[in-house]
Amino acid sequence: MVDIDENRLHMAEALVTRYCRESKMNLKVRAFKERRDALEGAEYVICAVKIGGYGPLEKEREIAEARGYYRGIGDRVSCYYGGIGAYHQIHFLEGVARDMQELCPDAWLVQTANPVFEGTNYITRHYNIKAVGVCHGHNAYKEIIEELGLEQDKVNVEVVGFNHCVFMTGFRYKGKDAYPLLDQWIEEKAEAYWKSERYMDPNRVFSKDQMSPGAIEAYRLYGVMPIGDAVRSATPWWTHTDFETKCRWYGKNGGFDSEIGWKSYLDSKKDIQANLSEIVESGRSVMEAYRPSETTEQHIPFIDSIANGVGEDTDPERAE
């Protein structure tokens, strides 16, 4: 693992080392402040770096809001890195790609840091490295099948697009087209759901945008359901013009990207950091705080497919 922040690096090393010990995993954990030291001879490189945290994005927002753009990004509600932030991120990725060409030319870069789509495409076009971009946004389809009351193991979905702009182009239940079930829910149950406590709960950190009126409006407009962050980035501009409007379309707090929703998200990040620090300082069990569970992230399945031939699509031309 690599981090230029020494305190954060030591905290992460302590957490992972303790987790391995508690779970009896025979893994060797090494921590580096210099990425070149870590890249030497690597087979897989996972990038989850956010240069400056959310500072560059908030600076971009501040500049734009001063010129009259609500939330600083107008209708571009989910492209975290359209300007200042994108520059910092892609500049960093260039450095990683150059170092990989020199130090681990056969390694795979698993690119998780936003902007995933732009960053992955840029470095694979300009540098001779293998890279795949991954995001977990497609998992939001599970909110749909949960609300429809479907058995998950009998559902097949196809989610197509690029980062923060993906749509459910295929939706089948027990072998049959399931979109009519969604249409029926919209017709018969949507209004009651939008008034329910589980949708309107103002204390929830993450707003339930996936089945919001805004998401359904986009579905009616496009004919296919936007999934995950696409509900934020591909929904009609008229649902994002001001806070009151966002509340009508995305619930009591105005959805994930409103001034309230976004603050809740940033506060949750601080809470996680504080909790991790407390675990390290107190010596509390990591496994008790974060019980083992099967991940929905793609990093491990992807690496497993490359290393062990497990069936996953590893064609970078088709990867996100």
Language model feature labels by segment:
Residues 1-6, 135:
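Conserved acidic E/D residue at the C-terminus of a beta-strand in Rossmann-like folds
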Residues 5-41, 48, 53-57, 61:
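Conserved N-terminal Rossmann-fold NAD(P) cofactor-binding segment
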Residues 6-14, 90, 117, 138, ...:
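Short, surface-exposed alpha-helical segments at coil->helix boundaries
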Residues 10, 51-126:
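Rossmann-fold NAD(P)-binding glycine/threonine-rich loop
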Residues 15-19, 96-100, 147:
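A generic secondary-structure signal
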Residues 21, 25, 105, 127-128:
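Proline-centered flexible-loop/turn and helix-kink motifs
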Residues 108-177:
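Rossmann-fold dinucleotide-binding core
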Residues 147-320:
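Long, compositionally biased stretches enriched for glycine and/or charged residues
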